[in-house]
Amino acid sequence: MDCYLLLLLLLLGLAGQGSADSHPEVLQAPVGSSILVQCHYRLQDVRALKVWCQFLQEGCHPLVTSAVDRRAPGNGRIFLTDLGGGLLQVEMVTLQEEDTGEYGCVVEGAAGPQTLHRVSLLVLPPVPGPREGEEAEDEKETYRIGTGSLLEDPSLDPSASAGPHEFRRRENSIPLIWGAVLLLALVVVAVVIFAVMARKKGNRLVVCGPSQSTGVPGMDPPSAAHRSSDSGLPSDIPHVRLDSPPSFDSIYTGSSLDPPSSEPPAPPSQPPLPPKVLMSSKSVTYATVVFPGGDKGKIASCEPVQDPPNSQTPPSK
């Protein structure tokens, strides 16, 4: 009976070893992640050496063992722990792409090395997806929301709660504000100066306007300025003013501009209106006739007539 029991256990062990060798467990993990593998061993192998090895072409390459050897350099990314009660646990952390391969738990018992469990590990390279961008946007939004909540609290310091970009933006806005204030002050000063100058110029025109003379430049004011009479002519020029426009008859057609002679003029056929004559003590060399009611700018004048050398001006009466 005992022989049959031992034979049955041996067959089960061989079957388990064959199944472990032929059908390894497939595990897929991304770069930087971790895996945890548990292996069951027999209770009679509790004191046996447990090994976590990588299966290569030349055989099992041990990575970590249950024996504590302080002289051998340990692997900082693979940990083997014997939990007792026939349970062995292996953990691989911070996986890299070169960790891809086939691994297994091996127990070196009295019957020889026995593979308890095999694992086919595939380490996937990192693939940036839209999820990472969404998480980054969510983090930025969370940072903005948190910053806004801190700023809304009046008990907190705004400069301490603001982020670096917000603080840099405030530093850049300070010179712009001062520049705008300086420009506004310059505009106000320019407007005030312009208003004062315009007021001074207006006062100068009001004071100097009536006293300006219409004389020729380079002449003295007394000699250049002439008082004008109501006819628009200077008072020192002899002229005749007629109350009404004269009729163009033979009286004016045959008139001469020669100096007055001693003989009295012939009496006119029709008595004209008495003209206003301004007598002058000087000899008259030209005459000016002004018609009332007409344009003052249109004045009939004649060329001056030179006196003969031997003629004598009769004395005025």
From Swiss-Prot:
Compartment(s) where it occurs, according to its Swiss-Prot or TrEMBL record: Cell membrane; Cytoplasm
Extracellular side: 21-175
SS bond list: C39-C105, C53-C60
Span of domain Ig-like V-type: 21-122
Modification after translation, per record: Phosphorylated on tyrosine residues.
Cytoplasmic face of the membrane: 197-317
Keyword list, A-Z: Cell membrane, Cytoplasm, Disulfide bond, Immunoglobulin domain, Lipoprotein, Membrane, Palmitate, Phosphoprotein, Receptor, Signal, Transmembrane, Transmembrane helix
Signal peptide: 1-20
GO cellular component, one term: plasma membrane
Membrane topology designation: Single-pass type I membrane protein
Lipidated residue numbers (S-palmitoyl cysteine): C208
Record text on subunit structure and interactions: When phosphorylated, interacts with PTPN11. When phosphorylated, interacts with PTPN6.
Function of the molecule: Cell surface receptor that may play a role in the innate and adaptive immune response.
Protein name per Swiss-Prot or TrEMBL: Trem-like transcript 1 protein
